[in-house]
């Protein structure tokens, strides 16, 4: 692997002007392209401290064998050149917004004598008008099926058209009046083109004129007593209205805009785009991309900049549109945040469009509501992507094998346990322990712990807390193993389900009678060393321990001799890293939910909770009857027994708990004059 010091530019040789740079590998292939306001500042950051770089960036620098740059005069030129180089070289370390499929569009071949309507995928061609993209081809076919009743335009291929012209007989669509049958001369070329142009006007949003004209024709036919034609026109108007209902007005001002939203985590980001034309959503597209890991390249502003550059650059290359409704670059692009290069991007997009383009962050009204809808779609897309990846058996097997190879384990970690600590400024310190078996969560084995020794009185020590949880968990394992009839029980998820053990033996304790293959703690070297020291103290040597640091997704292994080892770096697209991240995030979620529950109970605790035999229902009845604890404290035994279900003994216990007998009430109760509702 090349040494970065061998190709680092000489001090002072890098210009300070804006420009675009590219790294090449030993074979001359471009592996990364970037731009910078100051080439010197940006390039020096790659060589200053390799250990401080994100894993993906560090891998890129270690893979490269040379770096070169081009100075430009403006940031707009840098933006354009960066896009061109990424498009030309397809560098492996750059973020690429690739569709997982080619989205279909509705194409109208206006360059033919008899234009036709068709589902199309591929590069744009001159003389063809495009509508879309659509998320599915069936959505286009459904639209055609509905609208060809109103606009009976040709949808057949050139071969079918020629064959029916030769036999002088229309196809089935011609017989059922869903095609005007120009192949047999039922309409002229000019009449057929007029039908097609009306169809295009309808999809372009010019619906009011078409419906108004049809209503006039329907009324005229009715006055002439041509009821059959009037009924047909009525049905056509109904079909057009149904088609319009499928495209609900989302922006009342008839705006043409693209609405962009992101959802991301540490490794990946999902982007969704709604194409709004004439105030109606005409199409939707989505991507899931791998983030670079470099802090400056994982911000929302950077993701927006990269997406706009690549997406609209690609759209412009596919071919511009002849009118406003199908122009690939709209007048307005609504984004979640404005990038640092907003002015340069607006200038570049305006050049692509041929007129002014503005970038905006929606603040209120319909645009804000639509942006939130697109955001929810992005979140759903990211969730579905992760669930699909996690649920795939092949991916899970590859993930377990990847972890085994990276950590040098003897076997694949079929059972993984992970610990996470949660607290707020040292209060309500809790821990969670989650279990994954065969790469899937086993929620029946989840546990939570209230930290006893390592926390209290507003103090918290995460390292000591990790040690405490590890000790308690594996003490339980050793105790259950000793209690098993045959010494150490069978290791595996079904060890607790053997029929001969009986209902008591197969209950909760036996689930921890076998250890995990891999024990994960949330944190770096201090946390993982604390867990490893506990296992060493207990004499457990068959459990691998690692720590997963959140900042750079580094995997730490224990080193009890006091030296700081280098972390294990997984490739960012590794199934193994994805599984470890999912385990860690699940532990974090479970810990937070328990912490919030415990904190909520503490904040709503009442002196009545300590009264023996007084349940929640009767506590609510007392509070509802008297209105506050202060008034309840001032009541007599007879007044309290007037509440249904409260006897004299319970009433005296209530007054004793509130300090009424001694005349000294607890400080958090005696001054409580607030109203309390049940």
Swiss-Prot record:
Tree of life domain: Bacteria
Residue stretches of biased makeup (Basic and acidic residues): 479-491
Record domain UVR: where: 208-243
Region (Disordered): 477-508
Protein's UniProt name: UvrABC system protein C
InterPro entries the UniProt entry points to: GIY-YIG_endonuc (IPR000305), GIY-YIG_endonuc_sf (IPR035901), GIY-YIG_UvrC_Cho (IPR047296), Hlx-hairpin-Hlx_DNA-bd_motif (IPR003583), RuvA_2-like (IPR010994), UVR_dom (IPR001943), UVR_dom_sf (IPR036876), UvrABC_protein_C (IPR050066)
Family classification: Belongs to the UvrC family.
Annotated localization: Cytoplasm
UniProt GO molecular function: DNA binding; excinuclease ABC activity
Coiled-coil segments on the chain, per record: none
Chain's role: The UvrABC repair system catalyzes the recognition and processing of DNA lesions. UvrC both incises the 5' and 3' sides of the lesion. The N-terminal half is responsible for the 3' incision and the C-terminal half is responsible for the 5' incision.
Quaternary context: Interacts with UvrB in an incision complex.
Cytoplasm found in the keyword field: yes
UniProtKB keywords: Cytoplasm, DNA damage, DNA excision, DNA repair, Excision nuclease, SOS response
Gene: uvrC
Organism: Mycolicibacterium vanbaalenii (strain DSM 7251 / JCM 13017 / BCRC 16820 / KCTC 9966 / NRRL B-24157 / PYR-1)
Domain named GIY-YIG: residues: 16-95
SMART domains in the record: GIYc, HhH1
Statement: the UniProt record of this protein carries the keyword DNA damage: yes
GO cellular component, one term: cytoplasm
GO BP: nucleotide-excision repair; SOS response
């Amino acid at each position: 692997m090349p040494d970065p010091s061998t190709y680092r530019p000489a001090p002072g040789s890098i210009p300070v002007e804006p420009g675009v740079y590219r790294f090449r590998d030993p074979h001359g292939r471009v592996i990364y392209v970037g731009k910078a306001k100051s080439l010197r500042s940006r390039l020096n950051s790659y060589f200053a401290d390799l250990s401080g770089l994100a894993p993906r960036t560090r891998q890129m620098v270690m893979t490269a064998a040379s770096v070169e740059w081009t100075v430009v005069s403006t940031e707009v030129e840098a933006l354009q050149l960066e896009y061109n180089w990424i498009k030309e070289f397809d560098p492996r370390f750059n973020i690429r917004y690739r569709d997982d499929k080619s989205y279909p569009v509705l194409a109208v071949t206006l360059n033919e004598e008899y234009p036709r309507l068709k589902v199309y995928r591929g590069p744009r061609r001159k003389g063809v008008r495009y509508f879309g993209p659509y998320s599915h081809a069936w959505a286009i076919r459904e639209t055609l099926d509905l609208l060809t009743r109103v606009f009976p335009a040709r949808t057949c291929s050139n071969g079918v058209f020629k064959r029916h012209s030769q036999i002088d007989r229309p196809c089935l669509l011609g017989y059922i009046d869903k095609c005007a049958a120009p192949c047999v001369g039922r309409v002229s070329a000019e009449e057929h083109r007029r039908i097609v142009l009306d169809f295009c006007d309808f999809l372009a949003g010019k619906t009011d004129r078409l419906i108004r004209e049809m209503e006039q024709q329907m009324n005229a036919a009715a006055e002439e007593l041509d009821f059959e034609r009037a009924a047909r026109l009525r049905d056509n108007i109904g079909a057009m209205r149904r088609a319009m209902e499928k495209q609900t007005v989302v922006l009342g001002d008839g705006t043409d805009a693209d609405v962009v939203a992101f959802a991301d985590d540490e490794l990946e980001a999902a982007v969704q785009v709604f194409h709004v034309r004439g105030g109606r959503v005409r199409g939707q597209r989505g991507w899931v991309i791998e983030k670079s890991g470099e802090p400056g390249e994982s911000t929302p502003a950077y993701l927006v900049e990269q997406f706009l550059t690549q997406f609209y650059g690609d759209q412009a290359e596919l071919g511009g549109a002849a009118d406003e409704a199908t122009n690939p670059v709209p007048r307005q692009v609504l984004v979640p945040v404005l990038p640092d290069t907003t002015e340069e991007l607006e200038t570049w997009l305006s050049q692509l469009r041929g007129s002014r383009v503005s970038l905006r962050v929606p603040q209120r009204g319909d645009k804000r509501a639509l942006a939130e809808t697109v955001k929810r779609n992005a979140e759903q897309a990211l969730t579905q992507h992760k669930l699909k990846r996690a649920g795939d058996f092949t991916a899970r097997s590859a993930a377990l094998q990847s972890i085994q190879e990276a950590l040098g384990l003897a076997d694949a970690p079929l059972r993984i346990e992970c610990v996470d600590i949660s607290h707020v400024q040292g209060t309500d310190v809790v821990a969670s322990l989650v279990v994954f078996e065969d790469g899937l969560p086993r929620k029946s084995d989840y546990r939570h712990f209230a930290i006893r020794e390592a926390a209290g009185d507003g103090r918290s020590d995460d390292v000591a807390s990790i040690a405490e949880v590890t000790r308690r968990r594996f003490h339980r394992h050793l105790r259950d193993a000793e209690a098993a009839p045959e010494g150490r029980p069978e290791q595996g998820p079904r060890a607790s389900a053997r029929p001969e053990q009986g209902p008591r033996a197969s209950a909760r304790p036996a689930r921890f009678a076998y250890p995990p293959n891999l024990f994960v703690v949330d944190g770096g070297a201090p946390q993982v060393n604390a867990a490893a020291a506990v296992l060493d103290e207990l004499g457990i040597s068959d459990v691998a321990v690692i720590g997963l640091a959140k900042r750079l997704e580094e995997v730490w292994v224990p080193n009890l001799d006091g030296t700081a080892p280098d972390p294990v770096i997984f490739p960012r697209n590794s199934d193994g890293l994805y599984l470890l991240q999912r385990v860690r995030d699940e532990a974090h979620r479970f810990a937070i939910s328990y912490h919030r529950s415990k904190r909520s109970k503490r904040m709503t605790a009442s002196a009545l909770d300590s009264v023996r035999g007084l349940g929640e229902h009767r506590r609510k009845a007392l509070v509802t009857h008297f209105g506050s604890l202060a008034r309840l404290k001032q009541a007599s035994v007879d007044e309290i027994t007037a509440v249904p279900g409260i006897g004299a003994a319970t009433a005296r216990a209530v007054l004793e708990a509130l300090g009424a007998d001694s005349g000294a009430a607890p400080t958090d109760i005696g001054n409580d004059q607030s109203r309390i509702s049940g």
